[in-house]
Amino acid sequence: MKELHIISFNYPYPPSYGGIIDVYYKIWALSDLGIKIHLHCFVDQVPETIDQEIEEITENVFFYEKKKNPLLYFSGIPFAAAIRDSDVLLKNLEKINAPILFEGLQTTHIIRFLKDSGHQLYLRHHNNETEYYKGLSSSEKNIFKKIVYRIESLKHKGYQKKLLKKFDVVFCLSEKEYDEVKMYSGNAQLIHIFHGNQSVKQLDKKGNYFLFHGDLTTADNKKALIETIDLFKTLPQYKLVVASDRASEDIKRKISAVENISLTPILTTENLHHLLENAHANILISYQNSGTKVKLFNTLYNSRFVIINGNITDDPILTNLCLYGANMDEIRQQIITSAEKNYDDNEKRKEILEKTHSDHAKAEQIVKIIFKN
């Protein structure tokens, strides 16, 4: 029986945002191949019960509370890594002799104690954290948060450079991250994001509205939405639906002030899929250059046209499946153009996505690398 420790930066259920979607569907796909998963989760608060969806795909689940000491911001270690430190985790790892897969650099603070442990060490590199925090700093309006994010970006630069060489293999999400890791060390492997979609939806030629969906607590998504709202103010003939269950009062006011824009909550995954299936086109904009965003896969598998800017993906094959705008003027033109078009890309997407981006194929690749003997 092949066994694997997975150390997650959070409890991976429900799989409701980018990084956690990758973690959950990776576990699901590895479990489906017969890998025995020992899951370790850093959490704000230990849950009272473990969801059946997690129990069914894991052998064990362990929880560790993140440290709540604000003085850790003054540590030389990135704050996200400093708060994820646990002696109990080390003891649990030693009880079961199996390779360890760290989900993101924020889970790697304990690696300093594992050098001579005999465990094979692997990293799922979720983001270039240096660029991620730099992007957060640029998008953030609050001056205090802007400074904190900038400092964290600088911390990550040194931390990343020092740590990446310590792993047997670093599994990268995107071409950009793959090229960056190769600069530091020769242990990079490109494994695209796990997304949970299995087949491309067969949809008719027209949808009913344009859709913007995302977590509106992040500065990047808020900035993207405000730009999109301003765009649709100039396009009163088109309806925009904003789907999010985390909209601030300020965002709600901005939406309600524009007649052709409405806000709807994302209650469940099924609810989101229903919104995607009825959309004519999706607006995906980001100001952070951090590889392919997981919501791109959700829209390509489950909806019609997808209008993107350059930061949504660095994969030319995926870009070719979308309508691209380099700036908001070009995005506006793509909205107008797509509104008049019939959607007929089902077969093209099926051919590309189901062959080159299936979760099963990616899990098989990971298994071949980790369990090569």
What are these language model-derived features?
Residues 1-59, 95, 233-235:
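N-terminal subdomain of nucleotide-sugar transferases
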Residues 68-76, 122-155:
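Acceptor-binding helix/loop patch of EC 2.4 sugar-transfer enzymes
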Residues 84, 340-373:
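A charged, aromatic-enriched C-terminal amphipathic alpha-helix characteristic of glycosyltransferases
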Residues 90-109, 120-122:
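Short N-terminal targeting/anchoring amphipathic segment
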Residues 150-200:
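Donor nucleotide-sugar binding/catalytic pocket of nucleotide-sugar-dependent glycosyltransferases
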Residues 168, 276-291, 304-305:
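Acidic donor-binding loop of glycosyltransferase active sites
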Residues 193-254, 263-273, 277:
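Conserved catalytic-core segment of nucleotide-activated headgroup transferases in glycan assembly
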Residues 273, 294-302, 315:
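Short alpha-helical segment that forms part of, or immediately flanks, the ligand-binding pocket
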